[in-house]
Amino acid sequence: MIADDEGFLYPQIDSARCVNCGLCARACPSLNRSEPRKPLAVYAAKANDTELRLASSSGGIFSLLARQILAKGGTVFGAAFDKRDWSIEHIEVVNEEGLSELRGSKYLQSRTAGIYRKVSATLQSGLPVLFTGTPCQIAALRAYLNLQPSISTSNLYLVDVVCHGAPSPMVWQKYLDWQCEAASAQGRGSAPAEGRNIRRISFRRKNCGWKRFSLSLRFADDKEYLCQFPDDPFMRAFLKELCNRPSCHDCQCRELRSGSDLTIADFWGIEKFHPEVDDDRGTSLVLVNTDKGKSLWNHVVSGLDVMPATFDEAVAGNPALVRSPHPHRNRELFLKKCSAKRFDFLVVKMLRPCFVSCARTFVGQVLRRMGRRK
């Protein structure tokens, strides 16, 4: 895998060794689009264990699913921080202690080098496997295993998340450099060239509740950077489509095309549809997509507070289920300038409304006021 100028990883074919078998094209989810699906059932759910829920991004569903697999001697695969540089990689976990590494949202493209081979080897041993990831990672694993028909997937459980998109790893590293430079200037950390004194990162601290979550960086001196998601420059760049992977703007795996057994996400909008469930500590959206997913779900439901919901409610709060966002008009310019400019200033500049947008807003406000006066 080779990073391009925007920092995204892509496979590179060694033409000297290629035998033109076509396996790479057959395994690529972007080149092999499946048919859209509708879930068998939709639920709003939250773990009865309040501490577990507060430690999770939303309702704690992943941990209960993972515990079920571990209880059978199985293996759980998911995304974790590589604390050498705070990038993201997929790892395998075989005990309860390791689950904390996988718990919590990570808004980055994770490295999966060699992980599909490990999944294949675990399945060959006959042990159950829970693999969690983005829809495209689920689709890629399915395609990889389909090329090995001798391997049974009866013990494989696939869980994807509703994915907004994958930001550039390069942008994330530039953001961390900016954070460490700011900490160093305040005399409470080292500059990036001296190594990052970061001890912990959480994309989803619930210090102000689930709906107003914060991005948190804990430094070696125990000082914490804490910023609510609408105000943090990295989260703004991510959510405003300044730095996401090009394929995310035309994702081939939306509409449940990944082939996952279960899909989990935050149940955004729960306060509108089922206010009696919402306590602002986190409620998960769960889509049961297959009979295998239903079987796994039935084994964990006793530890949950569950309410039936509809697919329309799910889409209303998570439009990324069915459609891809458009890239920001300044996306390419932002990625070109990311290395040379101060990160927070550049994000503000790139997201500044253009003249046409400001003019449209002004005219709209005038027309609305005129309408009220008539």
Regions found by a protein language model. Name each.
Residues E89-G114:
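Glycine-rich phosphate-binding "P-loop"
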Residues V162-K174, R205-G209:
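Short, conserved secondary-structure transition motifs
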